[in-house]
Structures are given as structure tokens and as C-alpha cells.
Design a protein with these regions (language model features):
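Conserved, mostly hydrophobic/aromatic
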Residues: 128, 311, 386, 413, ...
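N-terminal accessory beta-strand-rich subdomains and adjacent acidic, glycine-rich linkers
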Residues: 21-269
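Carbohydrate-binding surface patches
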Residues: 561-598
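An acidic-aromatic substrate-binding cleft motif
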Residues: 238-318
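Bacterial Sec-dependent signal peptides at the C-terminal "C-region" and cleavage site
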Residues: 12-23
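Aromatic- and carboxylate-enriched substrate-binding clefts and catalytic-loop regions
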Residues: 324-506
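Sec-dependent N-terminal signal peptides
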Residues: 4-14
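Glycine-rich, aromatic-lined ligand/substrate-binding cores of catalytic
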Residues: 499-572
Length: 611
């Protein structure tokens, strides 16, 4: 990983900074933080327009609202100008911002802590640093956002209790003023939320979620948002408390939104000792037997070896051994033989595990370390850990320990059934992707439901939408929204390419979507034997054989529209790939200058006239 950085520090004098006024390097983003009668507040503007109207910020610890009756004093500033590499959408990322420091004193107790803000040319972020010893309880935060009323907001909806657990909602939109009443699951929404104002795109998110509980957003009347946490009564932390960054991304267009580096730049650089050598972090594609069942050969030694053979013949780097291997009485013998066979064929293996079988924190997660030792010993390259189902402090601590312990054993990690990414891929580059997205497995679940209904002589209910019986194929509108919503935050293991179960989409749509989300580990859902043997998909297979999973450059074409049309161009070396998905016919023009004039050959894949 290459990282270069330049930091300039200087004292911030009240007479020279205009009080608490702050600005980004170009001056287009400006913010102000101030202490009012009831607490601490901030505002954010973009090119002179109010983006976040006066909103509260603050934290409550041990039932003390440290933001009330607080004094705020400027303490310093620095300019940050760094470049670094994060595996994914482009070769070089940048962290260029102005950081402002404020000392905060809670007058009734005399307790002193710090507020940090950072202003980028495409956003604003803040966090608190609270020194202390022993165990304290974070009861909540006063964090608030008040975006413009005249906005449309995109959010992830799932009409079941799973909505706030797995981040697997369908992306839809409503007016900002109705967000608090639109969902039958209540006013609490998952991050991110994306607002389309008359002049820009505004995304609310968080970054650097470590040693803390993940934040959700409670929508309120008047288009306001408030912080919400899994632990309604609070969560305990020891020692100094550092909150995640509370982030507002501000983008002039969808290309700027998709290419923002704010989330990763707010995360620490990788540990130079833990990641001194990163040659073992190898992105690539993976075949996967779970989605299709591989014609009855699922979790048989012969069937999984055939998947490995198919991967080798197609030049695909990995195969994923999913849920089911542990049910075999000879599970470790099975895994050992399969891993050895995969190694002989030049294919790496990922292996699945339920998180509850790893989550005992006793003896510094001895249970976890033992499992990782075992899979590393037989030659496994990565682990897919599933069903964390939440973002409370318990899940977040587990995830961090998993990434650290896996890195010590040179193992890649693919978290599933998990929360949104917050930039972990920079600090722990062995996180090769993560779920936290509504992906194509829903088409499989729907097919299972419909088959069960038919077998029982019943008609599938089109409105059925509960865990285990979700009759909800992924619609094209969801896919046309994902790159500009959940996809902005980081890699998403959507597991694309479902030719045989496309729902209401087409084969070309399924192939195109494989290029639209970042995922350095690109797990392909389709039956490996259909993929390699069905002549109908031969043109698609030609693309899949050489499809990169990391890119040098990503460009969103200007005709793109959230939920209707997503067209993205990506470059790897001297080759450009352009893919699009849509919900209705649309004309797309490739901007002049995007493709070099010297380009001499293009391959076009589209749906046949008969579908």
C-alpha cells in the first residue's frame, strides 16, 4: 500500500479565524460550530447555500449531557494533504482538508474534552475525543442533521424486523418531509441517507466505526434527523472515548458523489507492522455453489471439486465454500482435501462460518483464533463470516478483532449479514469486501419460497415480505440506485450475475451490474456449470473471463439518474469497460474525450431481441 501525506500545523488565533467559522481548502464548503443556550450547534453551507441548517451536536456520558452549558474555545487547526491507495474504484485516493480543533468545557462539572471538525471540498465531518479512565456509559448523542425541506431522500426499506439488522433494504425514495412516516417499520433509518436538493447531492453517513456502536438515523417531523443506536439505554466503553466521524458528503453531481474519498480518508492508515507485506491480499473473482446448489452437487466433494475445476478453466481466482460444510461428519477432512485440491489447481478458497461460533470474547477471542489457525493451516485464503445481524458495540468489537486476527494469519475477510462499511477497508485492507447490501441472494430466496408454495398447492403471495418467506426479487430500480447510495460507502458483496433467476431484469442487466459496484472480491452467483457450459451466455463469459475487480479510474456518465439509469465507465490499464442498467429505454452518449481517439476495437454485449 502506498501512502504519502503532508501535514501543516499552526496555532489558531481567535482574531485570525473569525471565531468558529471554518472552510474547506477551496472555500466552497463552510461551517460554523458554536455554543448556544441549550447546547452545541453547527451549520454547513455549499457555495453560499445552506446545506445543513442549525443542528445540534453533542454526547451524553454517564447520564451527563456534556453539550449543555458548555464553553467552546478554538484550539488549533491543520491542513491535511495526503494520497493513499485503497483497493476498489480508483488507483489513487486523496485526503485534502482543513481540520479545526476545539476545546469544550462542561461548566457544571469542569470536564474538558475535544471537538474535531474536517472540511473537505466535498463535505464536512466531526467527532469528539473524550479523555478518561475506567468504564463509562455512552447514553447517546445529540447529533442532528437538518437538510433542506425541498429535497427528495433515498433510503433502504425492508418491511420486516431485519431492516435495521443486515442493511439489506430496497433503495426507494420519498420527500424529506415524509421520511419520518413513510416506513411501516418506524422512523429509524439505516445509513447512508442520500438527499437530492435543488442544487446538489447530500449524503449523511459515518466513518471510522471502531470501539463504538453504529449509528442509525431517526427521522423527525420537519425533515430533521437524530442519532439513534441499537443500545437504547447506552453502551459501555473503557478508557478514552473517540466517537466515529459524523459525515455530511456534498457533491455537485453523481460522478463527484461516487468518487468521494471522505469515508476512507477519515480512517487511519494501515498498521505498518500488521500490513508490512500485503502481497497476500489478492483481489479476484469467486465462484459460489450455494446460490444454485450446483445441480444437487452442493457440499459434496465431487461437486465442489468440479466448481474448483471450472474456476481454474475460466481463470477465476477463488471458490467460496459456504454454509453446509460444517454439517458433514468429516468436515475438517473434507475441507483439508478440498483446499489441497484447490491449491493444486491454482484456485484459492473462502470458507463460511456463523459469527456466533467465533464470538466468545474469553481469553482474547480464543475461540476465533483457534478457528482461524485451523483454516489457515489447511491452506484457506479467506473467511466469510455471517449473520452478525446488527451494529451494536458487540458486533463492532467482534468485527475489529476478526480483521486483526485474520491479518495476523494472512487471511482475507468477507463479513456478511453485517452493517454498512465506514472505511474499514483502508485500515484493514484484508477486508476484501462486505455485504451490508440487498443482493441477488433475494432472487434465490424468492425462488425457494415460490417452489415451496407450489409444492404445497398454494399460490405465492406477491405481498409476502417476512424473514424466510420473502417474495421479493431484486427490481431494476434498486440496482439503478445502489451505485449512488450504499455503493458510495465502499465495497458491496452483492454477488451479481443471476442469468437463470434474474427476477424482473434481463441477462444483459445481470452482467452489466457486475461492473457497477465496487467489490475487490467479486462473488458470482450463477451456477458455475451453467456459466461455463450454456452457449446462450457465451458472450457474457468472454467478459467475465477478463473482468477486473479493482480499477484505475471510475466515471459516472452524466445521463445517470438515481433509481432509473446508472451508467458507469471504468478503466483498468488501457482498457475501458462501460456498463449500464435502466428501468426504461434511455439514450446514452459517451462524452467526447472519455475514450482515447486511438481506441480501435470495442466489444458490445446486449440482450438478444427475444430476451
Amino acid at each position: 500500500m502506498r501512502t504519502t501525506a503532508f501535514f501543516a500545523f499552526m496555532a489558531l488565533l481567535s482574531a485570525g479565524c473569525g471565531g468558529t467559522a471554518q472552510k474547506s481548502p477551496s472555500g466552497n464548503i463552510r461551517a460554523e460550530v458554536f455554543a448556544g443556550k441549550e447546547g452545541l450547534y453547527y451549520t454547513v453551507t455549499h457555495d453560499g447555500r445552506t446545506v445543513i441548517d442549525t443542528s445540534a451536536l453533542g454526547i451524553t456520558i454517564d447520564d451527563t449531557e456534556l453539550f449543555r452549558d458548555a464553553a467552546l474555545r478554538p484550539a488549533g487547526t491543520r491542513k491535511i494533504d495526503e494520497t493513499y491507495s485503497v483497493t476498489g474504484r480508483k488507483a489513487v485516493s486523496e485526503g485534502r482538508c482543513n481540520e479545526y480543533l476545539f476545546d469544550v468545557t462542561h461548566r457544571p462539572s469542569g470536564y474538558k474534552y475535544r471537538l474535531q471538525t474536517r472540511l473537505y471540498d466535498d463535505g464536512f465531518a466531526y467527532r469528539f475525543v473524550l479523555p478518561g479512565d475506567g468504564t463509562r456509559t455512552v447514553n447517546g448523542e445529540a447529533a442532528q442533521w437538518r437538510p433542506p425541506h425541498q429535497s427528495r431522500v433515498w433510503f433502504a426499506e425492508r418491511n420486516s424486523g431485519w431492516k435495521l439488522l443486515t442493511y439489506a433494504g430496497e433503495w426507494i425514495s420519498t420527500t424529506a418531509d415524509s421520511l419520518h412516516i413513510v416506513s411501516r417499520q418506524g422512523p429509524v433509518q439505516t445509513m447512508p441517507l442520500l438527499y437530492r436538493t435543488p442544487d446538489e447531492y447530500v449524503m449523511i453517513a459515518e466513518a471510522a466505526l471502531y470501539d463504538y456502536s453504529g449509528m442509525r438515523l431517526r427521522a423527525e417531523p420537519g425533515a430533521s434527523l437524530r442519532a439513534d443506536f441499537t443500545e437504547q439505554e447506552g453502551f459501555e466503553l473503557s478508557g478514552d472515548i473517540v466517537t466515529p466521524w459524523r459525515v455530511t458528503i456534498i457533491a455537485r453531481d453523481l460522478d463527484a458523489l461516487v468518487n468521494t474519498d471522505i469515508i476512507t480518508s477519515l480512517n487511519p492508515a494501515p498498521d505498518p507492522e500488521l500490513f508490512a507485506d500485503t502481497s497476500w491480499i489478492v483481489p479476484g473473482r469467486s465462484l459460489w455453489s450455494w446460490w444454485s446448489g450446483i445441480d444437487g452437487g452442493f457440499m459434496t466433494l465431487e461437486g465442489e471439486k468440479r466448481v474448483i475445476d471450472t474456476a481454474a478453466s475460466l481463470g477465476i481466482e477463488y471458490s467460496t465454500v459456504d454454509d453446509g460444510w460444517e454439517e458433514r461428519p468429516d468436515k475438517w477432512k473434507f475441507l483439508h482435501e478440498l483446499a489441497g485440491y484447490a491449491q493444486s489447481r491454482g484456485v484459492g478458497l473462502f470458507v463460511w462460518r456463523h459469527w456466533e461460533k467465533l464470538n466468545d470474547p474469553a481469553d482474547d477471542y480464543r475461540q476465533m483464533r483457534g478457528f482461524l489457525d485451523s483454516v489457515a493451516a489447511v491452506g484457506i485464503k479467506g473467511v466469510k463470516v455471517d449473520f452478525m445481524n446488527g451494529e451494536g458495540i458487540r458486533q463492532i468489537d467482534f468485527n475489529t478483532h476478526l480483521l486483526k486476527n485474520a491479518a495476523r494469519r494472512r487471511l482475507l475477510v468477507n463479513p456478511h449479514g453485517c452493517q454498512k462499511p465506514t472505511g474499514e477497508i483502508r485500515t484493514y485492507p484484508n477486508e476484501i469486501t462486505r455485504e451490508g447490501v440487498r443482493g441477488i441472494e433475494l432472487n434465490r430466496i424468492t425462488a425457494n419460497y415460490e417452489k415451496r408454495m407450489r409444492d404445497e398447492g398454494r399460490t405465492p403471495d406477491p405481498d409476502r415480505y417476512v424473514p424466510g418467506d420473502e417474495n421479493q426479487n431484486i427490481p431494476a430500480s434498486h440496482n439503478a440506485a445502489l451505485p449512488f447510495t450504499r455503493g458510495v460507502l465502499g465495497a458491496a458483496d452483492y454477488t451479481p450475475v443471476a442469468f437463470t433467476m434474474p427476477g424482473g431484469t434481463t441477462a444483459a442487466h445481470q452482467l452489466a451490474f457486475a461492473l457497477l459496484l465496487d467489490s475487490p472480491l467479486l462473488t458470482i452467483a450463477e451456477n458455475p456449470f451453467v456459466l461455463s457450459g450454456d452457449e446462450r451466455y457465451r458472450p457474457a463469459l468472454d467478459i467475465i473471463r477478463r473482468l477486473p475487480t479493482v480499477w484505475d479510474e471510475t466515471v459516472v456518465l452524466p445521463q445517470s439518474e438515481i433509481g432509473r439509469l446508472a451508467v458507469i465507465a471504468r478503466r483498468k490499464g488501457g482498457t475501458w469497460y462501460i456498463a449500464g442498467v435502466n428501468t426504461a429505454p434511455a439514450a446514452v452518449t459517451i462524452p467526447a474525450g472519455l475514450i482515447p481517439a486511438t481506441a480501435r476495437k470495442a466489444q458490445i454485449v446486449r440482450d438478444a431481441a427475444d430476451g
